[in-house]
Amino acid sequence: MAVQPAQTAYDRAITVFSPDGRLFQVEYAREAVKRGTTALGIKVEEGVVLGVDKRVTSKLIEPESIEKVYQIDTHIGAATAGLVADARVLVERARIEAQTYRYTYGEPIDVDVLVKAICDLKQVYTQHGGVRPFGTALLIAGVDTKGCRLFETDPSGALTEHKATAIGEGRQEALDVFEEEYREDMTLQEAIELAVRALYEASREETTADNLEIAVVDKQGFRKLERKKIEEMFERVVGSEEDEGE
């Protein structure tokens, strides 16, 4: 996003609105999210799928050392896009919120309560001098007394609940896949396959199974898919598309 001369004065202070009602530092934080690798979530009746394209840029990097899907509590997980260090801070805060709630009330925290707490923190970082907005967005998924839940959080502190959504640089490509193929009556297995397909399309057909990180949250709790299962799923989904294209 190009900086116009008239707006430079409003870049200096995070708490100053421009004449047209914009907070430029929040907009720049959103740009950081757009530059991040694609993360997505899909909600079905059986549970919620979270997936991320980790984009390992060098063969010298151990793929398992890069983590962008996190467990928050036994029934909640999160996927991130944007600045990884900022995401870690928010994930740790979310874990503390969940643990504190469980210790205080003797029961697991509802997903929307946790999401609102994290978004409240994000919003505070848009109001005070000496800090900057978090340059990351989170997809927070879980299962609570209200059923399966999937939320998207914005650097401004805004939150929205979704059936399926994506963040990061491949957001639009993934949403195009969801618009065409998502169904509310999908099985969890079908949702996982859709996540793999959407991540592949979002990468402009350049990603590999090694770059994918996928987790599921259902009534049994949070769990990440094993590498072997992701490779088998990737081969089945991507292989079938290549066969159709021949």
From Swiss-Prot:
Q: What does this protein do?
A: Component of the proteasome core, a large protease complex with broad specificity involved in protein degradation.
**Any one Gene Ontology molecular-function term assigned to this protein's record:** threonine-type endopeptidase activity
- UniProt keyword terms in alphabetical order: Cytoplasm, Proteasome
Tell me the lineage of the source organism.
Answer: Archaea, Methanobacteriati, Methanobacteriota, Methanomada group, Methanopyri
Q: Name one Pfam family in it.
A: Proteasome_A_N
Q: How does it assemble?
A: The 20S proteasome core is composed of 14 alpha and 14 beta subunits that assemble into four stacked heptameric rings, resulting in a barrel-shaped structure. The two inner rings, each composed of seven catalytic beta subunits, are sandwiched by two outer rings, each composed of seven alpha subunits. The catalytic chamber with the active sites is on the inside of the barrel. Has a gated structure, the ends of the cylinder being occluded by the N-termini of the alpha-subunits. Is capped at one or both ends by the proteasome regulatory ATPase, PAN.
InterPro entries attached here? Ntn_hydrolases_N, Proteasome_alpha, Proteasome_alpha-type, Proteasome_asu_arc, Proteasome_asu_N, Proteasome_sua/b
Q: What is this protein called?
A: Proteasome subunit alpha
**GO cellular component annotations of the record:** cytoplasm; proteasome core complex, alpha-subunit complex
